[in-house]
Amino acid sequence: MGGFRFHQYQVVGRALPTENDEHPKIYRMKLWGRNEVCAKSKFWYFMRKLKKVKKSNGQMLAINEIFEKNPTTIKNYGIWLRYQSRTGYHNMYKEYRDTTLNGGVEQMYTEMASRHRVRFPCIQIIKTATVPAKLCKREITKQFHNSKIKFPLVFRKVRPPSRKLKTTYKASKPNLFM
């Protein structure tokens, strides 16, 4: 739905059944990736780190892409993340305004790459949530909550009323600023 670079997937997996544990615990994660292969890879990365289950002795049960319920209404999204920089690991909370969560996550990845030089593999999204307007913390998202917001027109190009009056060269330079 939309031309997003990152898609949200729900990945379900577990360790392979053994004689000791015939019904291993099933784990479900919501992850972002460019495609299903990247989402599976990220799932096994976290399983290896958190639960000591590797892909070689694990089993993938299901993978589904998650789509937005209302992709035309604008919402505030809060993203809790952990990232690895040159000096260590850091926790962070970010807020974005977008129509879909995928759009907000893409904004987050772009901002982290530009401001902190942190690329996709070094970022771990801990949690995401739709934040109501009264609970927003960041000024950059709060500024759009004003119902009487105005965007001033600071640059106007005066166009000729007809094609006949259009000229290549002007006698005087036009003043474009108001």
Curated annotation (Swiss-Prot):
Any one GO BP annotation for this protein: translation
Parts of the chain that traverse the membrane: none
One of the record's GO molecular function terms: structural constituent of ribosome
InterPro entries (alphabetical): Ribosomal_eL20, Ribosomal_eL20_dom, Ribosomal_eL20_eukaryotes
Keywords, alphabetical: Ribonucleoprotein, Ribosomal protein
GO cellular component: cytosol; cytosolic large ribosomal subunit; cytosolic ribosome; plasmodesma
A Pfam family recorded for this sequence: Ribosomal_L18A
Top-level taxon of the source organism: Eukaryota
Protein family membership: Belongs to the eukaryotic ribosomal protein eL20 family.
HAMAP family found in the cross-reference section: Ribosomal_eL20
Name of the featured protein: Large ribosomal subunit protein eL20x
Organism: Arabidopsis thaliana
